[in-house]
Amino acid sequence: EQKCLFTKGQIIEIFQDIINPNAPKITQVVNEGQLSIIKPNVAHTMVFTKDTTFLNLVRGERDHENYGITHTIKHIFVDEKEKNLLLEYYKFDCRSCGNNDLKRVVSLGYQPLANNLLKKINEKCELYPLEVNYCNKCHNCQLSVSVDPRKMFTNYLYTSSTSKVFREHFINAAKQYFKHLKLNKKKSYIIDIGSNDGVALKPFLDLGFKKVLGIEPATNLAKIANKKGIKTFNGFLEKKNLKKIKKNADLILASNVFAHSDKLKEMAECMLDLLSKKGTIVIEVQYLMNTLKDLTFDNIYHEHYNYWSLTSLVNFFNQFNAKIFKSEKVDTHGGSLRIFVKKDKKVKIDSSVRKMLKDEENFGIKDFKTYQEFGKKIYKIRENVLRNFKKIKEKNKKIIGFGAPAKATTALNFFGITKEIDFIVEDNKLKHNKFIPGVKIPIKNKSQIKDKNNTLLVLAWNFYNDIKKNNSKLSNNFLNIKDLESNN
């Protein structure tokens, strides 16, 4: 073991266990005054982000029993391109509060961009660290890198309307907001941020609302929405675009997009700028507490820069003198959090906020040990899945995946599962004849399933019951990928 004390500067260290073939490549920031500890049998290198001075700490005299014997072997595992990617995209401070002493929760290795499916099997794709860090000041969780959003959202293949579950979710949500927020069908102006193909705004039009606007950066999805008659602005929500967007919204929706912004404060400022004095912002995010409790690590991918609890969201919005006045849990994405926000500092805070904050504190949302335990359990899950996969293949079972959501890219790349799955079928036609990046598993139409004796492994596990019910003719054997995670 070797220790280095950094007396000046900053580095990104990259290391990988060379004994364990499944070990991920991991990055870690070392700041001034901190130690770098290099374990035996580990490939290790440093990317210097500043002028840096460090001391090698050695026990005792240099003249020891191994003196003069080479115990470090040259092993290049970070090239110039990777170094430049790290320097460009690494996030050194908390995007919520600015704290630069972030703690590592889990590393899922270097992974491709989850929704950037390959058009050809030999097409190259860039890999980026997929790692979650924790801020012990505001309790925000975020990725260690922030990939340029234009690489992920300019041409987006995920269409929310493909899922009946999501269509029904947004229909019910629209009815709820109409009733409880006392909206007016003729006068109320509704904006949806990251509106996709218009799935959340269509129910408002169906209810008779006249003034709706979607804001969607993916050109292909904005075109789909506009063709449906759902007025959509094609672009990111950022200050330079505000002059192109009508203001004084009575309701602003942000469903599963608030985690998708690296420029988080700019996004919040834009939303508050577009909001009328008495208007309401409703935000839905995947709920961090569900991720930690249910071990749904596959909800981690590069599009999701942030992972939110109510605790961290309250801390965030307090910076803008905006108040979360109501909170509730919803079932989407394996467990989500919905919050209601107003500019009015005197707004009455619903008891749901106090109760949820107390529940989070009791769970340990402010205790780093909670996050460390989560990380340990995720590595154990990988061991279990690989062992259980091997058992299935030993029975000469042909495995076909069902569903190619972003979570499938994360899980399959983390597990290192490639040829063990023959192919994947998908309801979304935009994904047909493409390949999962990294593992290069082909995605096909359901018509390619010819034998009911095949095992259908449901990768879109949050829709398992619906998939099994609606596709019973395809297979006699459905298996939820979550069932492979147990230690059987």
What feature does the model see in each segment?
Residues 19, 45-86:
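Double-stranded beta-helix
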Residues 89-165, 328:
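N-terminal juxtadomain amphipathic helix
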